[in-house]
Design a protein with these regions (language model features):
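Juxtacatalytic substrate-recognition/specificity segment
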Residues: 10-128, 139-148, 154-165, 169
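Hydrophobic positions within repeat-based interaction scaffolds
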Residues: 6-8
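Short, well-ordered surface patches within globular domains
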Residues: 129, 133
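Alpha-helical protein-protein interaction scaffolds
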Residues: 1-4
Length: 169
Protein backbone atom coordinates (compact mmCIF):
# COMPACT_ATOMS: atom_id res chain seq x y z
CA UNK A 1 0.00 0.00 0.00
CA UNK A 2 2.88 2.37 0.70
CA UNK A 3 4.28 1.71 -2.78
CA UNK A 4 0.84 2.27 -4.30
CA UNK A 5 0.54 5.60 -2.48
CA UNK A 6 3.85 6.68 -4.03
CA UNK A 7 2.66 5.52 -7.46
CA UNK A 8 -0.64 7.40 -7.22
CA UNK A 9 1.13 10.59 -6.20
CA UNK A 10 2.94 10.50 -9.57
CA UNK A 11 -0.27 10.04 -11.57
CA UNK A 12 -1.59 12.85 -13.74
CA UNK A 13 -5.09 14.14 -12.92
CA UNK A 14 -7.56 15.35 -15.52
CA UNK A 15 -10.80 16.93 -14.30
CA UNK A 16 -14.07 18.39 -15.36
CA UNK A 17 -17.22 19.08 -13.33
CA UNK A 18 -18.26 15.42 -13.39
CA UNK A 19 -15.04 13.38 -13.34
CA UNK A 20 -11.66 13.14 -11.70
CA UNK A 21 -9.49 10.93 -13.93
CA UNK A 22 -6.11 9.68 -12.70
CA UNK A 23 -3.59 7.88 -14.89
CA UNK A 24 0.11 7.93 -15.74
CA UNK A 25 1.38 11.07 -17.45
CA UNK A 26 2.44 9.04 -20.48
CA UNK A 27 -1.00 7.50 -20.93
CA UNK A 28 -2.76 10.79 -20.19
CA UNK A 29 -0.89 12.34 -23.11
CA UNK A 30 -1.99 9.50 -25.41
CA UNK A 31 -5.67 9.06 -24.53
CA UNK A 32 -6.51 11.02 -21.39
CA UNK A 33 -8.69 13.64 -23.07
CA UNK A 34 -10.46 10.93 -25.09
CA UNK A 35 -11.15 9.00 -21.88
CA UNK A 36 -12.54 12.09 -20.17
CA UNK A 37 -14.75 12.86 -23.20
CA UNK A 38 -15.99 9.25 -23.33
CA UNK A 39 -16.85 9.29 -19.63
CA UNK A 40 -18.73 12.56 -20.09
CA UNK A 41 -20.68 11.08 -23.00
CA UNK A 42 -21.49 8.01 -20.89
CA UNK A 43 -22.73 10.22 -18.07
CA UNK A 44 -24.81 12.42 -20.36
CA UNK A 45 -26.34 9.39 -22.09
CA UNK A 46 -26.92 7.07 -19.14
CA UNK A 47 -27.98 9.62 -16.54
CA UNK A 48 -30.54 11.03 -18.96
CA UNK A 49 -31.81 7.57 -19.88
CA UNK A 50 -32.12 6.43 -16.26
CA UNK A 51 -33.23 9.85 -14.94
CA UNK A 52 -30.36 10.16 -12.47
CA UNK A 53 -28.64 13.26 -11.22
CA UNK A 54 -25.27 12.41 -9.70
CA UNK A 55 -24.47 14.74 -6.83
CA UNK A 56 -20.68 14.30 -6.83
CA UNK A 57 -17.92 13.72 -9.36
CA UNK A 58 -16.95 10.16 -10.22
CA UNK A 59 -13.29 9.30 -9.63
CA UNK A 60 -11.72 7.03 -12.25
CA UNK A 61 -8.25 5.57 -11.75
CA UNK A 62 -6.59 3.77 -14.67
CA UNK A 63 -3.61 1.66 -13.66
CA UNK A 64 -0.67 0.97 -15.96
CA UNK A 65 0.44 -1.92 -13.70
CA UNK A 66 -1.96 -4.76 -12.97
CA UNK A 67 -0.46 -5.24 -9.50
CA UNK A 68 -1.30 -1.63 -8.61
CA UNK A 69 -4.87 -2.13 -9.84
CA UNK A 70 -5.06 -5.29 -7.71
CA UNK A 71 -3.81 -3.60 -4.55
CA UNK A 72 -6.07 -0.55 -5.01
CA UNK A 73 -9.11 -2.65 -5.86
CA UNK A 74 -8.75 -5.83 -3.79
CA UNK A 75 -5.95 -5.10 -1.33
CA UNK A 76 -3.78 -7.77 -2.99
CA UNK A 77 -1.63 -7.57 -6.13
CA UNK A 78 -2.58 -10.83 -7.88
CA UNK A 79 -6.17 -10.78 -9.15
CA UNK A 80 -6.01 -11.56 -12.86
CA UNK A 81 -9.08 -11.45 -15.06
CA UNK A 82 -10.59 -8.16 -13.95
CA UNK A 83 -10.61 -5.23 -16.39
CA UNK A 84 -12.37 -2.74 -14.15
CA UNK A 85 -14.34 -2.50 -10.92
CA UNK A 86 -16.95 0.02 -9.81
CA UNK A 87 -17.48 1.07 -6.21
CA UNK A 88 -20.26 3.55 -6.90
CA UNK A 89 -18.60 6.90 -7.53
CA UNK A 90 -15.12 5.33 -7.71
CA UNK A 91 -14.00 3.26 -10.69
CA UNK A 92 -10.69 1.43 -10.98
CA UNK A 93 -9.49 -0.01 -14.28
CA UNK A 94 -6.50 -1.69 -15.85
CA UNK A 95 -5.00 0.33 -18.67
CA UNK A 96 -4.45 -1.32 -22.05
CA UNK A 97 -0.69 -1.32 -21.36
CA UNK A 98 -1.23 -3.63 -18.37
CA UNK A 99 -2.97 -6.21 -20.57
CA UNK A 100 -0.38 -6.86 -23.27
CA UNK A 101 -0.26 -8.64 -25.66
CA UNK A 102 -4.09 -8.71 -25.90
CA UNK A 103 -5.54 -5.52 -24.41
CA UNK A 104 -9.27 -5.08 -23.93
CA UNK A 105 -11.11 -2.11 -25.39
CA UNK A 106 -10.63 0.58 -22.73
CA UNK A 107 -13.59 2.57 -24.06
CA UNK A 108 -15.97 -0.35 -23.57
CA UNK A 109 -14.53 -0.99 -20.09
CA UNK A 110 -15.03 2.62 -18.96
CA UNK A 111 -18.58 2.78 -20.38
CA UNK A 112 -19.42 -0.55 -18.72
CA UNK A 113 -18.03 0.51 -15.34
CA UNK A 114 -19.72 3.91 -15.43
CA UNK A 115 -23.03 2.16 -16.11
CA UNK A 116 -22.45 0.37 -12.79
CA UNK A 117 -22.09 3.81 -11.17
CA UNK A 118 -25.56 4.66 -12.47
CA UNK A 119 -27.27 1.40 -11.48
CA UNK A 120 -25.61 1.16 -8.07
CA UNK A 121 -26.47 4.78 -7.29
CA UNK A 122 -30.09 4.35 -8.36
CA UNK A 123 -30.51 1.25 -6.20
CA UNK A 124 -28.33 2.42 -3.29
CA UNK A 125 -26.16 -0.65 -3.97
CA UNK A 126 -29.16 -2.95 -3.51
CA UNK A 127 -29.30 -4.97 -6.69
CA UNK A 128 -28.09 -8.41 -7.68
CA UNK A 129 -24.68 -8.42 -9.31
CA UNK A 130 -25.98 -10.43 -12.27
CA UNK A 131 -28.55 -7.72 -13.00
CA UNK A 132 -26.02 -4.90 -12.75
CA UNK A 133 -23.64 -6.83 -15.02
CA UNK A 134 -26.41 -7.54 -17.49
CA UNK A 135 -27.42 -3.89 -17.70
CA UNK A 136 -23.79 -2.79 -18.11
CA UNK A 137 -23.19 -5.32 -20.89
CA UNK A 138 -26.44 -4.24 -22.58
CA UNK A 139 -25.52 -0.55 -22.36
CA UNK A 140 -22.04 -1.27 -23.77
CA UNK A 141 -23.63 -2.72 -26.90
CA UNK A 142 -26.14 0.14 -27.10
CA UNK A 143 -23.28 2.64 -27.07
CA UNK A 144 -21.29 0.78 -29.71
CA UNK A 145 -22.37 -2.52 -31.29
CA UNK A 146 -18.70 -3.44 -31.82
CA UNK A 147 -18.16 -3.52 -28.05
CA UNK A 148 -18.94 -6.47 -25.87
CA UNK A 149 -18.85 -10.17 -26.48
CA UNK A 150 -20.70 -11.59 -29.45
CA UNK A 151 -22.13 -15.02 -30.00
CA UNK A 152 -19.49 -17.30 -31.47
CA UNK A 153 -19.68 -20.90 -32.72
CA UNK A 154 -18.54 -22.33 -29.37
CA UNK A 155 -21.18 -20.40 -27.35
CA UNK A 156 -23.84 -21.31 -29.91
CA UNK A 157 -22.97 -24.99 -29.64
CA UNK A 158 -23.06 -24.81 -25.83
CA UNK A 159 -26.42 -23.00 -25.88
CA UNK A 160 -28.03 -25.46 -28.27
CA UNK A 161 -26.46 -28.50 -26.62
CA UNK A 162 -26.28 -29.74 -23.05
CA UNK A 163 -23.04 -27.95 -22.12
CA UNK A 164 -24.53 -25.13 -20.02
CA UNK A 165 -25.59 -25.62 -16.44
CA UNK A 166 -29.29 -24.75 -16.10
CA UNK A 167 -30.13 -21.78 -13.87
CA UNK A 168 -32.20 -24.15 -11.72
CA UNK A 169 -29.02 -25.97 -10.69
Amino acid sequence: LVTLKDTLEKYHTLKNDDFILRMTQEEAEIYGQRALALLQKAKDTLCKKYELELKQPTTVEIFAEQKDFGVRTFGMPDNPGFLGVCFGCVITANSPSSQMPNPANWEAVLWHEFCHTVTLTLTKNRMPRWLSEGISVYEERQANPAWGQSMNPKFREMTLGDDLTPISK
